[in-house]
């Protein structure tokens, strides 16, 4: 019989909050006896925007902005019901997007 795997993908704009959340998830899973692979840092998505500074003329003067989306991947191998309950009860900080696949 194949072992069950829970794949957790985390996304955030702030890498410090993201690493803190990943650490909380790994600690909760390890406390219940599940095997954990990760957190694996995935490539950071960088979106760049150029905006003209002047409201009327001077296209040569532009300002650049960027948004960095940091991502982490955590695999919980062979989780028990206790592991899933512990992960559901975690209170993670705002600003972290969590995607869970069974």
UniProtKB/Swiss-Prot annotation:
Protein's UniProt keywords contain Flavoprotein: no
UniProt-listed Pfam families: Ribosomal_S10
Molecular function per GO: structural constituent of ribosome; tRNA binding
InterPro entries: Ribosomal_uS10, Ribosomal_uS10_CS, Ribosomal_uS10_dom, Ribosomal_uS10_dom_sf
Signal peptide start and end residues: none
GO cellular component: ribonucleoprotein complex; ribosome
Keyword Ribonucleoprotein: yes
SMART domains the record matches: Ribosomal_S10
Entry coiled-coil feature ranges: none
Example GO BP: translation
Gene3D superfamilies, per database record: Ribosomal protein S10 domain
Keywords associated with the record: Ribonucleoprotein, Ribosomal protein
Assembly behavior: Part of the 30S ribosomal subunit.
Protein's job: Involved in the binding of tRNA to the ribosomes.
Family (UniProt): Belongs to the universal ribosomal protein uS10 family.
Protein name, as recorded: Small ribosomal subunit protein uS10
Native organism: Roseiflexus castenholzii (strain DSM 13941 / HLO8)
């Amino acid at each position: 019989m194949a072992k069950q795997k829970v794949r957790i993908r985390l996304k955030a704009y702030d890498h410090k909050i993201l690493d803190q959340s990943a650490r909380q998830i790994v600690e909760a899973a390890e406390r219940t006896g599940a095997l954990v692979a990760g957190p694996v840092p995935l490539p950071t998505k960088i979106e760049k925007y150029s905006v003209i500074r002047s409201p009327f003329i001077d296209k040569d003067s532009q300002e650049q902005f960027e948004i960095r989306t940091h991502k982490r991947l955590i695999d919980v191998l062979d989780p028990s019901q206790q592991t899933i309950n512990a992960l559901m009860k975690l209170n993670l900080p705002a600003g972290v997007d969590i995607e869970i696949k069974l």
